[in-house]
A protein has these predicted regions:
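Amphipathic alpha-helical and helix-coil boundary elements used as assembly
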Residues: 1-376
């Protein structure tokens, strides 16, 4: 175990979290093999009780200077999902839906604490190609195309990756509402939010997509979708995308919907700061105490940065430290009823023709499907 001197936790919807820790130990020769690429848990305490757990895998470990009694260390904790960035591949997934592809991808990397919450039909993709992009980029690209969001749930011994196609029905934080107080920082007897800035931004109002399939060449598979909450902006700002990159009309509407939601992800947002550690991306909360009544509503964090220091426990080595113990957070929120989605990621491009191997059944040279296409 280490003594935590400083920490910074960055977490967001649809992103791997990063927990940077500055540590101290009375041991000056820790074996790196016992730490690097090993699981670890950070516990944030409040009023003598654990307020948050953050479990992850150590990605970076540094030994720093040694003082009179203690040696300083630095450590980076990330989820197992971040390890997918270390691998890339060239392959084709056939006749699998995106939830099935993601599940197979995570199983391949032994990400076993994984929970899918699927409420809508996701059609299988005839061909889905990974063209040299990293496994993590493929995971995010497919998830964002399909309108899936993910976040992490923690306990003392594990972190669970939760993936869903509906955000509105996800968790709410425990322990009652989050309080707002305009009093100066440090003057409140309980955790509060002490600043709240609400913004609205003009964004794309409509999304139109079209694509064709040789199976029905005269059908344009066109889909239109208008955004929500357009009362305060013009409704004529339209984005037209072609090709829509779907071969079935049943997939066209959710593709159009997820892209529009990604373009409008910050149309209504709030930036807050405070010291209530219960704020977690994806987990909704009720706000109370704001002087403007309509801000006292349900909100959902999409990004949170927690920072804390604990110099007092370093005894004589903390003599020149600027602070004793401190904690604060900054967060970005959206209204709870907003089906927030990340911006879509571009597909990788292949540079010119590729050499492929023609395959076929045993005893035959090639395999043709019902339209005469040769399988490679």
């Amino acid at each position: 175990a280490f003594d935590v001197v400083e920490f910074e936790l960055e977490e967001a919807l649809c992103e791997p979290f990063r927990l940077n820790l500055k540590l101290a130990s009375d041991k000056n020769a820790i074996d790196f093999r016992q730490v690097l690429d090993q699981p670890g848990t950070f516990t944030l305490w409040q009023d003598g009780r654990p307020a948050r757990y953050v479990h992850g895998i150590v990605s970076h470990f540094t030994q720093g200077s040694s003082g009179f009694r203690r040696t300083r260390y630095e450590l980076l904790l990330e989820p197992q999902l971040a390890r997918l960035e270390l691998c890339c591949n060239w392959r084709i997934f056939q006749e699998k839906s995106v939830p099935e592809i993601l599940q197979a991808l995570l199983k391949e990397h032994r990400v076993l604490d994984y929970e899918q919450r699927i409420y809508h039909e996701h059609l299988p993709r005839e061909y889905c190609v990974q063209a040299g992009d990293s496994d993590h980029y493929l995971h995010d690209r497919l998830a964002f195309e399909e309108g899936l969001v993910y976040y992490f749930r923690f306990d003392e011994h594990r972190h669970t990756l939760v993936c869903s196609d509906r955000l509105y029905v996800q968790e709410r934080i425990a322990g009652g509402p989050v309080l707002f107080s305009a009093q100066p920082e440090g003057d409140n007897p309980q955790p509060v939010l002490h600043s709240f800035r609400y913004s609205e931004n003009v964004r794309t109002a409509r999304q139109t997509q079209r694509d064709y399939s040789f199976k029905r060449p005269t059908y344009d598979q066109e889909h239109h979708l208008a955004g929500e909450a357009l009362e305060h902006q013009g409704s004529s700002y339209e984005r037209y995308d072609y090709p829509g990159r779907y071969k079935r009309s049943g997939a066209g509407r959710p593709f159009t919907e997820s892209r529009l939601r990604g373009h409008r992800r910050d149309a209504r947002e709030a930036s807050v700061s405070g010291d209530d550690p219960r704020l977690i991306p994806g987990h909704a909360f009720a706000l109370e105490g704001h002087p403007r009544a309509d801000f006292n509503a349900w909100w959902r964090p999409v990004r949170v940065v927690h920072r804390g220091t604990q110099y007092a426990g370093q005894e004589e080595e903390s003599a020149d430290a600027p602070l004793g113990v401190s904690y604060d957070l900054r967060a970005e929120l959206v209204p709870e009823d907003v089906e927030w989605r990340p911006a879509p990621l571009p597909r990788p491009r292949i540079d010119g023709p590729q050499i492929a191997t023609v395959v076929g059944p045993a005893g035959e040279e090639i395999h043709c499907d019902e339209w005469g296409r040769v399988k490679v």
